[in-house]
């Protein structure tokens, strides 16, 4: 028989060693015996015994031989028996080096798994490609060390339980040796259920839950466990490319960020928290880790996605399905919490959406703290000296899901997930080219930095702990936003939405977009390659054409030159792209509105400017992420630095403020923020004669009806603010202003709030007029240039 390759670690050095051979076929045992013969030849004075490792689900009788080998009296003396080394050994089978995507898919078929070939296939491999067979040895441990670990961590006392413990430790050591050869992408937690159920810590917590049983906890662990397999890992990239086949095949990464993250992941376990705009995100993160040969992530997902054949496949590739509503199930909450802690303790990486669900508006949602609190508990309990919260920014040039999101905004119901839904989703990915997928990894946030050392004060102060969690989560989200590149899709959509259906020529699009690009360059904001191409007319044409045919831009070619516009029915879809870039223009938009407010303010206009900037920040806090108050003021001051002696000019007021705004490039508030205040104003108008404690569903229905009336009357600029998604945050604003609760002066305060919003909308009108004057001046200058040619 041709000799197989042997791993460098598969060397025995101890004088007395028990080799535990994990084998599935006689061929594998032959290979291990051949390897053991080599070890004996190298160390003739050492004693090597070999025992076949019982399978995981073997009956108790199968452990008898191992029980005897572990007995202190089995060796020449009890002491020498305890000093005996245990070394697990197995044969791993590598897949063919030139395997295609089709080959990876075919591995799902019975008898085609390259990692677990049949005995007949094994003999053929040894004849034709013996390098695919590797004898590997796991890390050794003394019997005394294993016995002490067993006593310290489990509730078991019987010698047969100790043998089971040693078996599990052997299999775990082999798994570590295996992924060192196969690659970090194959690293996964093994034997989670038996390890946790045998844990003294887990059983003690279980005893404190009324009515809880080990059997019920075991069923929940079965539901959570991933059942990881190498074939499924290989399929992650195949399925990921299938689900994203409408995009460029190569994801766009920042190589410096990838290198920094790789170094960080070598030091600490991490939770990868990704922005969530599409179901595709669920495959982007695993594929990104594989692309860059980084350790895999164990993705949390709603159990609603565990359907058909996809459920088992996703589970075996690292997906952890969790129930949606667990508030009234203390046992499930406990099992989930302990499962998260166990995975973190074993230094595996977790991942989920920091927003908890897809953002259907294009902007980031507030972070959800549910799973984060479990990770924090694991850290504070000392299961790791630090845990990194690694933000992941995922953005797209285009998404086919915006049609669905636009329907949601108009009040449609969510389509339930299922096989038909999955088929339609994957089918839609191949209908056209959607551009690139951009993946960014900003600097990770240290849990230790925000929560202090393990076992610290926060363990005894739930309120302080929750506040620290909120600050930590917002910091992760803030870093995600700062790393998210601005796309051409977002800039073009934002510009065309401001025209309210009026078409623009290529030259008009090009010269108007340059101010935004100049601003992003000054601020050193990250931009996509598609946005960089907007510097040229060809790049603008490519971006506008990519959005044409109702995706969501309409192109008209019947005249002297093509023109582009957004039809009313496509405004909600275009708004998704526009909202994805607001973060880059948020503070400069607030500056414009604060200047407009100061123009008609009485008294100290500088003070009025600052007061209004802070007020706008407060009103918008449910829709957008902001820096803390001190940093926000510093950012606003930096935004004003473009105008020399701005406070002096602001204090004069009148035409000076007009001149300041006219000189500002770009003017973005109308494009970026008007729609949100229009939605707030619609809700405020509904509240004028609504019951004090009106419910969210009734408020939304009334706002939709009134909003449609306002669109018909021209009282709002477009149909975009008439959105269930925007009304949801508008209601949060109203609750924050204490306008949805009985009070003696409620009616007066509701009227005052609507008046305040109308005054803000008046400021939008003022800034918009100046922006139009800028556009006319640019257009006049451009025409003069064309006339000279």
From Swiss-Prot:
Catalytic activity, EC: 2.3.1.15
Topology in membrane: Peripheral membrane protein
Pfam families (alphabetical): Acyltransferase (PF01553), GPAT_C (PF19277)
A single BP term in Gene Ontology: CDP-diacylglycerol biosynthetic process
Keywords for the protein's UniProt record, in alphabetical order: Acyltransferase, Cell membrane, Lipid biosynthesis, Lipid metabolism, Membrane, Phospholipid biosynthesis, Phospholipid metabolism, Transferase
Residue span of motif HXXXXD motif: 276-281
SMART domains hit by this protein: PlsC
SUPFAM superfamilies associated with the record: Glycerol-3-phosphate (1)-acyltransferase (SSF69593)
Pathway connected to this protein: Phospholipid metabolism; CDP-diacylglycerol biosynthesis; CDP-diacylglycerol from sn-glycerol 3-phosphate: step 1/3
Cellular component, GO annotation: plasma membrane
Main location: membrane
Entry keyword annotation includes Phosphoprotein: no
GO molecular function, one term: glycerol-3-phosphate O-acyltransferase activity
Catalytic activity: sn-glycerol 3-phosphate + an acyl-CoA = a 1-acyl-sn-glycero-3-phosphate + CoA
Compartments (UniProt record): Cell membrane
EC category: transferase
UniProt xrefs under HAMAP family: Glyc3P_acyltrans
Listed NCBIfam families: PRK03355.1
UniProt domain comment: The HXXXXD motif is essential for acyltransferase activity and may constitute the binding site for the phosphate moiety of the glycerol-3-phosphate.
Protein family according to the UniProt entry: Belongs to the GPAT/DAPAT family.
Protein name: Glycerol-3-phosphate acyltransferase
Organism lineage string: Bacteria, Bacillati, Actinomycetota, Actinomycetes, Mycobacteriales
């Amino acid at each position: 028989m041709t000799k197989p390759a042997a791993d460098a670690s598969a060397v025995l050095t101890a004088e007395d060693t028990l080799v535990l051979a994990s084998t599935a076929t006689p061929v594998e045992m032959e290979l291990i015996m051949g390897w053991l013969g080599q070890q004996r030849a190298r160390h003739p004075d050492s004693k090597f015994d070999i025992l076949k490792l019982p399978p995981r689900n073997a009956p108790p009788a199968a452990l008898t031989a191992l029980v005897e080998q572990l007995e202190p009296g089995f060796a020449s003396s009890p002491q020498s028996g305890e000093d005996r080394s245990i070394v697990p050994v197995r044969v791993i089978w590598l897949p063919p080096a030139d395997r295609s995507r089709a080959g990876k898919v075919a591995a799902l078929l019975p008898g085609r798994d390259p990692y677990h070939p049949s005995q007949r296939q094994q003999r053929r491999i040894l004849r034709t490609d013996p390098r695919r067979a590797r004898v590997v040895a796991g890390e050794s441990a003394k019997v005394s060390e294993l016995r002490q670990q067993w006593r310290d961590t489990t509730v078991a006392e019987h010698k047969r339980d100790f043998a089971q413990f040693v078996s599990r430790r052997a299999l775990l050591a082999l798994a570590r040796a295996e992924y060192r050869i196969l690659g970090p992408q194959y690293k996964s937690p093994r034997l989670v259920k038996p390890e946790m159920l045998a844990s003294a810590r887990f059983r003690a917590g279980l005893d404190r839950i009324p009515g809880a049983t080990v059997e019920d906890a075991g069923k929940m662990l079965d539901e959570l466990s991933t059942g990881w397999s190498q074939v499924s890992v290989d399929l992650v990239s195949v399925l990921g490319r299938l689900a994203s086949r409408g995009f460029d095949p190569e994801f766009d990464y920042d190589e410096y960020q990838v290198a920094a993250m790789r170094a960080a992941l070598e030091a600490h376990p991490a939770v990868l928290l990704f922005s969530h705009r599409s179901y595709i995100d669920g495959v982007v993160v695993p594929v990104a880790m594989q692309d860059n040969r980084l350790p895999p992530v164990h993705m949390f997902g709603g159990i609603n996605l565990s359907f058909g054949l996809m459920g088992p496949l996703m589970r075996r590739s690292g997906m952890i399905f969790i129930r949606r509503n667990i508030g009234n199930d203390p046992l499930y909450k406990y099992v989930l919490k302990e499962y998260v802690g166990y995975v973190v303790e074993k230094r595996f990486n977790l991942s989920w959406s920091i927003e908890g669900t897809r953002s259907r508006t294009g902007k980031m949602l507030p972070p959800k703290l549910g799973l984060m609190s479990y990770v924090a508990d694991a850290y504070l309990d000392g299961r790791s000296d630090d845990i990194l919260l690694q933000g992941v920014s995922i953005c797209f040039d285009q998404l086919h899901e915006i049609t669905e999101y636009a329907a949601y905004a108009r009040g449609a119901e969510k389509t339930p997930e299922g096989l038909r839904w999955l088929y339609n989703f994957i089918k839609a990915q191949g209908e056209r080219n959607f551009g690139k997928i951009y993946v960014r990894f900003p600097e990770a946030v240290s849990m230790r930095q925000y929560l202090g050392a393990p076992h610290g004060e926060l363990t005894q102060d739930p309120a302080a702990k929750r506040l620290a969690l909120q600050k930590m989560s917002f910091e992760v989200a803030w870093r995600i936003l700062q790393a998210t590149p601005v796309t051409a899709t977002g800039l073009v959509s934002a510009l065309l939405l401001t025209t309210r259906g009026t078409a623009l020529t290529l030259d008009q699009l090009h010269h108007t977009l340059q101010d935004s690009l100049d601003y992003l360059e000054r601020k050193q904001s990250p931009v996509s390659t598609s946005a960089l191409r907007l510097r040229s007319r060809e790049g603008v044409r490519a971006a506008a054409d990519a959005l044409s045919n109702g995706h969501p831009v309409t192109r008209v070619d019947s005249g002297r030159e093509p023109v582009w516009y957004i039809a009313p029915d496509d405004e909600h879809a275009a708004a998704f792209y526009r909202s994805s870039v607001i973060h880059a223009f948020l503070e400069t938009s607030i500056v414009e509105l604060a200047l407009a407010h100061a123009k008609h303010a009485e008294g100290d206009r500088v003070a009025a400017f600052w007061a209004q900037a802070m007020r706008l920040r407060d009103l918008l806090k449910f829709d957008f992420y902001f820096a803390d108050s001190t940093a926000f003021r510093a950012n606003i001051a930096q935004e004003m630095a473009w105008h020399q002696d701005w406070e002096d000019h602001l204090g004069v007021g009148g035409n000076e403020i007009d001149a300041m705004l006219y000189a500002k490039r770009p003017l973005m508030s109308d494009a970026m923020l008007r729609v949100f205040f229009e939605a707030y104003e619609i809700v405020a108008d509904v509240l004028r004669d609504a019951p004090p404690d009106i419910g969210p569903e009734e408020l939304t229905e009334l706002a939709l009806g009134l909003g449609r009336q306002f669109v018909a009357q021209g009282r709002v600029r477009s149909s975009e603010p008439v959105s269930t998604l925007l009304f949801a945050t508008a209601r949060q604003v109203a609750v924050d202003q204490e306008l949805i609760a009985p009070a003696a002066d409620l009616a007066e305060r509701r009227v005052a709030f609507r008046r305040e919003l109308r005054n803000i909308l008046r400021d939008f009108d003022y800034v918009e007029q100046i922006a139009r004057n800028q556009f006319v001046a640019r257009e006049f200058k451009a025409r003069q240039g064309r006339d000279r040619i």
